[in-house]
Every structure is written in structure tokens, then in C-alpha cells.
Amino acid sequence: GVVVKCFPNNYLGWHLGKVGGFAISKFSGGVELNNFGYLTKKGDKYYTYVNTEVQPEYVCDLGYKFRGHQYWHAYSDKQIESLRLLILHLKDIYPKMDLENGIPKMLKEGVHPKEAFEFNEDAYNAKQFGLWSHTSVRKDKFDCFPQEELVNMLKGL
């Protein structure tokens, strides 16, 4: 749940790389929720992509597959609360920041979390502003995934 600032606000961070395009990097900020992402279940154990075992209490079972994976390294309650506070803090600094559109709006309209967190052409092309995830603008990314606690936090913004 610790927030780390990587560079000053007045600098442009090309946080989406070559695939993400310049337009969206210019008009967006990047926040990274640190974890190992998807997990592979082998027997009754769960493993990260680097073959490190994850204890069951740190496993999020979505109950469905998101980007081909059902099991994920869970975000902690502290991470989700820190993210919520950071989003609200950034909204205070940047009043034009759009929290009404993007993933929160889709979730509030009843779109299934799996779909709300998927690639969105309008987000990718910077045609629809709002709160998005790496997965909204990159087909090769796995963060963020729709963990129930994260979904509920975003719906509550």
C-alpha cells in the first residue's frame, strides 16, 4: 500500500511504450499496482510466471478467465485503499481528471468486470477519456485484472 512517485508532474512519461502510442501517453498518467499478475495452478498449488509459489491466501480466483487466466496474485486491501486515496488526491490536483468515464462508468452501468477491463479501442486512440487500465489500451498487458475488491472500489468513486 505504499505510493511511490517516479518522476515530477511536469514531465511526460511514455508509460505505455511503443505499442501504447504517444497520444494517450501525453494525456494520461500511469499508476502501477505491483504484483505478479496471473497464476498457474498445479495440483493444489499456485505459481507465478517466474515459478514462485504463492500461498492460497494471496490468490484471487475470479471464477472466470480474464485474458486466459482464472487465478491471479491478489491485490492487498492496503494496495486498493492506497490506490483509491491516490486517485482522489490526483483529482484534487487535476480537477479536469475524468473519473466518471472509463472502467468506473462501465461497471456502474452493469458491464461485466471482464469486459470493462478489456481492450477498448476508444481508450487506446485517446477518443474516450476516463479512468482506464493497462489492459484497456494494451492487448499484451495483464494489469489490472478485475479483482472484486478493486471493482467495488472503482464503482464507489
Describe the role of every protein-language-model region.
Residues 3, 12-14, 104-105, 126, ...:
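Generic preference for hydrophobic/aromatic residues in regular secondary structure cores
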Residues 42, 100-101, 105-109, 125, ...:
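Polar/charged alpha-helical tracts
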